[in-house]
Regions:
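A cross-family acyltransferase "interaction/gating" segment
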Residues: 135-182
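Membrane-anchoring hydrophobic helices of lipid-metabolizing enzymes
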Residues: 1-66, 110-111, 174-176
Length: 182
């Protein structure tokens, strides 16, 4: 039964998630602040690392559709779901975490940065928390490659918080929201 359930979830993530999320995105009023940082780095073909809390991962996904960013994603089943959704948004997943395959994933990101231009995304508190307590991977990658870290903040007028460890932020349809590059 578990296998059938997992196959259904993966089918949803592969086939249905993108159209549903794009429709959902159309209901949001999204304001982007400091987008000039990304434009500046991209115009110079310079590497950078986007960093945001695990709880805020949905809005950056919707905003960065088609931009080819490489996101660090766990090797667990939840990570497979996220990987399939990322691919549908023309984003890349580098699989690994602090508990499984992290060293290999880190080396992939580091090689990408050193061979640049390369754009990476991290949730420094993921995949298992604790919530809003950053692990050192993002800082280490930045210090070893010279790539600046661009923190992302997210806010919304109407939202729901999931009961998960990260208290995932689900922005309600027809909300006003802000994505802020620091």
């Amino acid at each position: 039964m578990k296998k059938i359930y997992q196959k259904l979830i993966l089918f949803f993530a592969t086939v249905l998630a993108r159209p549903i999320l794009l429709l959902y995105r159309e209901t949001l009023s999204i304001k982007i602040i400091n987008k000039r940082y990304l434009k500046k780095f991209r115009s110079r073909n310079q590497n950078f690392i986007l960093s945001f809390w695990h709880e805020n991962m949905i809005l950056p996904l919707l905003v960065h559709d088609g931009q080819g960013i490489h996101a660090l994603v766990s090797k667990h089943f939840d990570g497979e779901i996220i990987t399939r959704i990322l691919r549908s948004f023309r984003l890349a997943a580098v699989r690994g975490s602090s508990t499984r395959g992290g060293k290999e994933a880190y080396q992939v990101l580091k090689r990408g940065m050193l061979n640049g231009p390369f754009e990476a995304a991290f949730t420094p508190d993921g995949p298992t928390g604790p919530r809003r307590k950053a692990k050192l991977g993002v800082v280490r990658l930045s210090s070893e490659t010279g790539a600046p870290i661009i923190p992302i903040g997210v806010a919304a007028t109407r939202y729901y918080r999931m009961g998960s460890w990260d208290r995932l932020l689900l922005i309600l349809p027809f909300s006003r929201c802000v994505l802020y590059y620091g």
